[in-house]
């Protein structure tokens, strides 16, 4: 029987009970279609995942161990081994929500799109590049179910942060039919340990973000697709500035990062209309000294906003189980 869906799970130093919850949350998929799971152990300190999978005695669950290449490299390994007609990605400490993800898979079977994006703010069905030309795309690969033929040779860049954003942008530049649905059947686990004050890691995040922007700028694409890519780059530059104000370690790092963004012509933010948030941020950050001045206030506002978002997400999740 042909495998309809391959679920790829990159795993790194994950606790067994958390991985168990992730895998258990997928059991319902068999009610709709044949599926498989590929767990890629990305060089964890303890080599237990292969033995754990063997103990499950489930023929559709597979494990691979490799040297550490980051989430992107682990997903690439999963792609190479996957046999499904469609592929999707789930992080090992997250899990699927039965009711809503069941509905998402029914959309997939009914419409048979090249790409399905769930948890979208708007409903859309049409060319993926047209969607990116008009709207903000979801930058998380875990929100997509992708036809293998559509993916083609597209892969993640290993060993970097922000690999999702590069991958999802390039995905929308493929000649593909996109379906977006409002249902969100994916539960993202809030990871307080991932918020680090390590200056070296923060510096690497900014460097990797710039690398992603440069990689996308240098992508050879048809002239008709260029406006969609440029819009996406503008939005990503806006996100870079917000991240800079949230995580920067001082005036020097702020100014150095702005200079780097200026060298690729994305600072100041290009003078275009991408909505009120983009417009206001462009005005507020048009000069480097303005960015330095507003950063302390921006840090507090972003922390408050993120805290409120986490509270709403938690309450919504509890409501689903009432």
Give, region by region, the residue ranges found by the protein language model.
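A conserved acidic beta->alpha catalytic loop
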Residues: 25, 38-51, 91
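Conserved nucleotide-sugar donor-binding catalytic segment
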Residues: 130-204
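Cell-envelope/extracellular polymer assembly enzymes that use nucleotide-activated donors
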Residues: 4-6, 25, 36, 166
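Short aromatic/hydrophobic "clamp" motif used to bind/position activated sugar donors
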Residues: 87
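Membrane-interface aromatic/basic loop that binds lipid-linked glycans or pyrophosphate carriers
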Residues: 2, 248-322
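Conserved donor NDP-sugar-binding/catalytic core segment of glycosyltransferases
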Residues: 99-129
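Short, well-formed alpha-helical segments that are part of the catalytic scaffolds
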Residues: 14-28
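Glycine-rich, basic loop-to-helix element that forms the pyrophosphate-binding segment
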Residues: 66-82
